[in-house]
């Protein structure tokens, strides 16, 4: 793998780090969390000015870059514990529209994502799914010139911030999964917002006889599972990169604490934290290099292994950082507790490290 960053990539990373360092002090982040939806419209606008919402999108709509640039952005957002829905909008939402949308849908929606005008969120997982992507009981009944959606979705991350939802449902006519573009204020849509462990916005979504025009269906009917798998795989890689950013920041905070308190006897434990962070970064790079591979089996195997390893490193580093800080580490007034909470949430996203180990084993057995 060649991960020597180009001048443009280094400039992107450095400018974003300066922005996050200046805008996302712990005090400001706490203030953002205290707002109704736990976000900063100003920060969203500043990220748009940086051009990061164009990453991975086609050049025809002003897009540039790809997985490697997204990795750099996710690392920096992780370092600052940035709350804005970059992953939901760019990696998941933008990826689904890019890969599965019609020409007209791509032309209409992708430019709005690129400028930050549109925040789009995937509403897919349901009760009892256990991270299985084709476990969908929501139904889309096709009528004359319309669809009627019925069902419910749980833990829809960033839903309270969304301008548009991408909702999955089983197409009664086509037989497979279809995706639908649904405005949150559509009659029959009910959202119940709440906060996750790390303070981020999420919601459960109920669809009660939601009537949509046929044009609201994203792409072709009944064949959305492949696009969902690809988008989620890219999200695996992006979350690995975010975890690396969180881990590196947590190590820096821990080193400062050890030096300030002159806790030299803990140096061995800290060196192990640094070593494991380096290994996690290597696995993040591997995930980034394979997240859009055409060979589905190879892609899923590598991404499962990468996420499992990074998740275990995240758990270890978080535990060690908390122990080395002592009781003060549990306080919401110090940064370490917020970094540890974010690592826990990343590890639980789309399947925790134990689930990914099982998935990796299943893939190996299937190939043997």
Language model: regions and residue ranges:
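Alpha-helical interface subdomain recognition
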Residues: 1-81, 100-103, 112, 116, ...
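Short glycine/proline-enriched turns and hinge-like loops at secondary-structure junctions
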Residues: 66, 132-134, 158-162
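N-terminal glycine-rich flavin-associated loop
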Residues: 84-104
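Short beta-strand-to-turn element immediately C-terminal to the catalytic PLP-Schiff-base lysine
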Residues: 99-101, 141, 167-170, 181-184, ...
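A short, Trp-centered hydrophobic/proline-enriched beta-strand micro-motif
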Residues: 116-127
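Flexible, small-/acidic-enriched active-site or ligand-binding loops
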Residues: 131, 135, 155-156, 183-221
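Cytochrome P450 C-terminal beta-domain/meander region
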Residues: 132-150
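A short core secondary-structure module
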Residues: 146, 150-189
């Amino acid at each position: 793998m060649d991960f020597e960053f180009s001048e443009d990539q280094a400039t992107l990373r450095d400018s974003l780090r300066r922005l996050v360092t200046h805008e996302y002090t712990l005090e400001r982040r706490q203030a953002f969390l205290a707002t109704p939806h736990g976000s900063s419209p100003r920060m969203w606008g500043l990220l748009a000015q940086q051009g990061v919402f164009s990453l991975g999108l086609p050049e025809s709509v002003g897009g540039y870059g790809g997985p490697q640039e997204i990795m750099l952005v996710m690392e920096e957002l992780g370092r600052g514990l940035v709350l804005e829905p970059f992953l939901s909008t760019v990696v998941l939402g933008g990826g689904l529209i890019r890969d599965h949308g019609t020409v007209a849908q791509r032309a209409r929606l992708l430019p709005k994502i690129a400028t930050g005008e549109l925040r789009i969120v995937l509403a897919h997982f349901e009760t009892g799914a256990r991270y299985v992507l084709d476990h969908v009981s929501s139904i889309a009944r096709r009528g004359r010139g319309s669809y009627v959606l019925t069902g419910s979705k749980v833990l829809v991350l960033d839903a309270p911030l969304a301008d548009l939802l991408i909702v999955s449902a089983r197409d009664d006519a086509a037989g497979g999964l279809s995706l639908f573009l649904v405005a949150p204020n559509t009659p029959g849509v009910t959202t119940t917002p709440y906060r996750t462990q790390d303070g981020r916005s999420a919601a459960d979504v109920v669809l009660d006889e939601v009537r949509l025009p046929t044009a609201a269906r994203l792409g072709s009917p009944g064949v959305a599972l492949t696009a969902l798998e690809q988008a989620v795989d890219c999200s695996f890689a992006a979350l690995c990169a975010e975890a690396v950013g969180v881990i590196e920041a947590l190590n820096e905070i821990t080193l400062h604490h050890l030096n300030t308190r002159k806790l030299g006897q803990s140096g061995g434990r800290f060196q192990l934290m640094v070593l494991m962070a380096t290994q996690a970064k290597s696995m993040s790079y591997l995930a980034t290099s394979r997240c859009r591979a055409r060979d589905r089996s190879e892609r899923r195997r590598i991404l499962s292994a990468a996420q499992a390893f990074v998740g275990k490193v995240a758990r270890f580093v978080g535990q060690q950082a908390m122990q080395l800080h002592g009781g003060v580490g549990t306080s919401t007034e110090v940064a370490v507790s917020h970094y540890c909470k974010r690592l826990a949430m990343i590890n639980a996203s789309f399947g925790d490290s134990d689930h990914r180990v099982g998935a990796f084993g299943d893939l190996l057995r299937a190939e043997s």
